[in-house]
Amino acid sequence: MQVKTMTLHAALLASLAASFDADAASIAGQTTFQNNCANCHSVDSNLSSRAGPGLFGVLGRKAAGVPGYHYSQALIKAGAAGKTWTREDLDLFLADPARNVPGTTMPVGVPDKQTRAALVDYLAGLQGPVTAAAPAKAQVSAERSGSWDDNQPGRIHHIKVTDLPPPFATSSAGNGPRVEARPNGSMPTVPQGFAVSVYAVDGDKPRLPLRAPNGDIFLAATAKGEIKVLRAKDGQASATPEVFATGLSRPYGMAFWPSGANPQYLYVANVNAIVRIPYRNGDLKARGAPETVVAQLSETSGGHTTRTLAFSKDDKTLLLSIGSATNVATEIGATPPEPIAQWEAKHGVGGAWGVETDRATVMAFDPDGKNRRTYATGLRNCVGMLVHPGTGDVMCTVNERDALGDNLPPDYLTRVKQGGFYGWPWYYIGDNEDPRLKGQRPDLKGKAIVPDVLIQSHSAPLGMAVYQAPKGAKHAFPKEYEGDVFVALHGSWNRGVRTGYKVVRVFMKNGVPTGQYQDFMSGMVLSDREVWGRPAGVAVAADGALLVVDDAGGTVWRIAPQR
């Protein structure tokens, strides 16, 4: 009897251990999903789409199988060829999406095998009847205002705080674009008096450009893990980009240091580290291995993965923007792990916690990576960042939160004040409280800074550049453009009728934004469903032309005055 009892106890313990292991694995997978995937994917049985398709019931589903979602042509072809998401296929895809399905728009994988296995286990448990809801009908009179068919070079926009609708005035849309090949003969539309041409083409679809002192154009090929460089022999067009550095981890932001004609380093922001590469003016190949300057940027690296760099005007401060891990931090709880005063003394006024610790911020360091401190908080995703060459002001373009409606809240461009709090996640555009976090931080009311320029909601402003014609530039823009800021609007997914997909000119007066912006380059949207281009970054070339990087078509466009 004693032997039988011991055997039963052992079996029970083994069963409990197995159950505990399964629960732990499920929790680990769910945590991985929340920290890395939830910004873009839902797991509800309605298969609602965000920037990416719904993942409920993904195991056993054919690739590109969510009705109504605008998949890349690469995944559509894979699904048509019979690709189905088994555990093995999903594991391979998540390890390296671009290698498994070349041409996919999935931006980032899960390289760690154990973490990936837990995520696949979690997704495997999302099974049951699918109750896909019919797409909401667009309220055309309200939603088409500010949409793509309003785009027209020369059109001026001025959105005011008093223009904001209430939350949930429209339903939240999952309306990502289907990217098509550029139709023969199609070109972007630019203002009268300007001409647009192809400057370079790169199948790796780089995103952010940076001009070197000698005029070379550096490009962050984020998905490839490379930095590339373009050299235009005649100023009009460039040959195929050359690879400057490889082996990087989703590089995005770049900055030369020190400023001036003879920098010593190219600083590069990886997804969770800052490195610097020895550089001398005119180098086309890295002259040394990357040196780690900051080994870890934040405890989590999922969610928004772009990191942008800039140096202060005196070269003494290295600035870094880090986007949020989630849409609106609903999972972090109402209180930090220590009293708010103590927490904010370490992380800044309005600094979030949990998976959002040191996220949605601009951080500051000395050029050697030491003396880390919080520069500003509440900036959900400052993708574009620069230091104004005249005023020395730090400036950000910010992608605001999703799922409050087609026209709420606006994205924005703003000067960023040291110690400033810009609202996220509890407030938006000043003292407007997010209803999903209602009542959690009344102490912050009145502390959120209203941004300088409100941009049509869900436009997704990315890279920007102050227009300053280099000395002796042969293709300088007219004088009235001098000092204004060009911004690439990547385009919406969370709006019933898409918006963005253009480059705009932000009007400045004595280095201060006026609040108005003007359409400058458009014409990349084919219909409510399809686009052929998505502006991601801008730079002023050595000859004064404006370069626009399109990361959908892999094209660098050149815009110059007609002579």
Give the positions of each predicted feature.
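Gly/Gly-Pro-rich "capping" loops immediately C-terminal to redox-active cysteine motifs
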Residues: 30, 42-87, 105-107, 243
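Beta-propeller domain segments
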Residues: 137-192, 263, 324-373, 377-521, ...
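C-terminal capping alpha-helices of c-type cytochrome domains
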Residues: 84-134, 546, 552, 561
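Hydrophobic core register within WD40 beta-propeller blades
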Residues: 209, 254, 309, 382-385, ...
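Sequence/structural segment immediately N-terminal to covalent heme-attachment motifs in c-type
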Residues: 25-46, 55-56, 119, 200
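Conserved beta-propeller blade signature
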Residues: 216-220, 263-267, 317-321, 393-397, ...
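Surface loop/turn motifs at the tips and blade-to-blade linkers of beta-strand repeat domains
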Residues: 198-203, 243-249, 293-301, 374-378, ...
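Asp-box/WD-like beta-propeller blade repeats and closely related beta-sheet repeat scaffolds
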Residues: 241, 250-251, 255-257, 264, ...
